[in-house]
Amino acid sequence: MKIDFHCHSFPAEFFRALKRYYPDVIELREDAKGLVGVWAKTPLPAWDHDARLEDIDRAGVDVEILSNPPIYSRVDEHAPELCRLTNDAIAATCRRDPKRFKAFAHLPFNNMDLALKEMARTLDELHFAGVVVTSNVGGR
């Protein structure tokens, strides 16, 4: 079995929230395939479930574990909402095809009480496979 455990997904909800809270960070565009977020001068298409299934079938991948790029550089009051809406969007993808997609949760590490609550929610209610923890949060 081939498992891709480092697969970033970019839910449209995540792009829209970034634009709302941090308009200097992302530019949103529409193209023939849908929403594209331009982040650090890199165009990133919003998640397309059917296109992703075609991609992993072509690559011979059996399961992908989805996560979002770490948003820990923005550890302000919006982090809990960004994590929750991103986790909810990724969970919706996993529900569409639970044998092919699993998820790692993002947690608002700037608020440990909320991080623990979101971890419990994603593991217990959304049935995520784990959580994302990077080497630093907010430069620490």
Model features per residue range: what roles?
Residues 1-140:
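Helix-coil boundary/capping segments in enzymes
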